[in-house]
Amino acid sequence: RQMCIRDRPVIAQKTGADAASVVYDAYQSAIAKDIDILIADTAGRLHTQDNLMQELEKIKRVLKKHNENAPHETLLVIDGGSGQNAIQQANEFHKSINLSGLAVTKLDGTAKGGVLFAISDSLNLPIRFIGIGEAIDDLKPFNARDFVDALFD
């Protein structure tokens, strides 16, 4: 099933559909339409849910069968208020699917997201994006100076 959000095509299936199949369908659609960026949102997974972590591994295997370089980015999105639990979460996701970077959300409230430094350092991962609200335009490229300044405000 395809719909559009802000004039961007979105591929979706019914709840409970095989995640790897949905991503494969989206990949095939992107290729057919000469779209060069595909974002697969696999939100809602906890590192303690083995079956959902195995789904992520399957998604990666399916994509690699069709493009040995895929996925080109594998970002872990961390809730800015999650605290030290995010370290274990990042370790498990990295071990499972080899992350390429980090993003942090919910920095529009009291959360500071300071745990990102520990994760970035221990896993040698760049911080790519920060989320400062719920609108699509509230996802911003990470700027280290601005982030550090905000930590001390």
Predicted regions and their residues:
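Short, small-residue-biased leader/transition segments that mark boundaries at the very start
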Residues: 1-5
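P-loop NTPase nucleotide-binding/switch module
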Residues: 13
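Flexible, glycine- and charge-enriched loops at secondary-structure boundaries
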Residues: 16
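Conserved catalytic-core segment of NTP-binding enzymes
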Residues: 19-33, 47-153
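Walker B beta-strand of ABC/ABC-like P-loop ATPase nucleotide-binding domains
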Residues: 38-40, 103
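Short glycine-rich anion-binding loops that position phosphate/pyrophosphate groups of nucleotides
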Residues: 43-45
